[in-house]
């Protein structure tokens, strides 16, 4: 038995989960929020009960020390020697990393070099890695990349129709994200279907505040909706998804905003929030639609129609689909959105059962038994994938 910590470090947050491996039992989990502010929030689950503390946590190093102290204080581990591996989520691995990797000084330098591709995320991930290195320098640490799973995409999927030298010189191409989630749910789908992953054509719909669709054929990602950044693809909570690129200079001209300001609008003030004008939360928008709000209805129609574009396109790319998977916050919990996405797909062999669709946050087949295309709800578990990779690469277990 070995104890593995899975870490997801954001710019002002640190999400953690402690696993006992190989049983994959979750021993504790928690979240440090508002790092760098005087009213930081530390939450940890001990014996099924949440403990919450508001205190001053000036940086990630202090957050890590506090987390490790809480593990010993609460008897979750007797000593820090019991921790045999650490797994870090890293958003961008570029073309350099097609798999998770044991962290060395060189790997850390490479992740730093890739920060220009993910300026909001990679620097925060690096801070998390370094904070743990200071406290547990001899414990093997593994980097698990959001982009790695999509490195199997063919050139026809990842190249943009731009001058080829932009790809060669600047690495401009589609990378795709949510890879750890897409990998987990497609592997789990194969188990639930009782079929080898290598024989399956799967559509994975990761629908949360950030959303992406992936076409997974034979266990390999062959295309995905996000692009060079997580701004591309379907309409999201606050992100625009795909737009006409000529709109950017046009908006700049009309509003007097800079490139950075327009990109900020596309990232943080667009999507469902932009369309409705009041919320990025689908629950609020569905409630407003029920009250007769026109913009709520339009926003939901846009959200669903963009998902349809990818389902149709990827079904054509794979010459058919064996199963459609719904995961992440909306995919796992919104029966209404699943129903709207699936309605009208009978032409491609999709027959969903409205009764079975009435599930929230649990694994379920929601298609009729006779449906040629199976529809499965699978709660994602990126943390367990991180823990598995630590066992696989860190020589622990």
Curated annotation (Swiss-Prot):
Substrate binds at residue 89. Keywords: ATP-binding, Cytoplasm, Kinase, Magnesium, Metal-binding, Nucleotide-binding, Transferase. Its cofactor is Mg(2+); Mn(2+). Mg(2+). Can also accept Mn(2+). It comes from the Bacteria. Its EC number is 2.7.2.1. It catalyses: acetate + ATP = acetyl phosphate + ADP. It is found in: Cytoplasm. GO terms for molecular function: acetate kinase activity; ATP binding; magnesium ion binding. Mg(2+) binds at residues 8, 382. The keyword Metal-binding applies. It holds the Pfam family Acetate_kinase. The active site is at residue 146. ATP binds at residues 15, 206-210, 281-283, 329-333. The record marks 178, 239 as: Transition state stabilizer. Transmembrane segments: none annotated. GO terms for cellular component: cytoplasm. InterPro entries: Ac/propionate_kinase, Aliphatic_acid_kin_short-chain, Aliphatic_acid_kinase_CS, ATPase_NBD. Belongs to the acetokinase family. Homodimer. Catalyzes the formation of acetyl phosphate from acetate and ATP. Can also catalyze the reverse reaction. NCBIfam families: ackA. This is Acetate kinase. It comes from Bacillus cytotoxicus (strain DSM 22905 / CIP 110041 / 391-98 / NVH 391-98). The lineage of its organism: Bacteria, Bacillati, Bacillota, Bacilli, Bacillales.
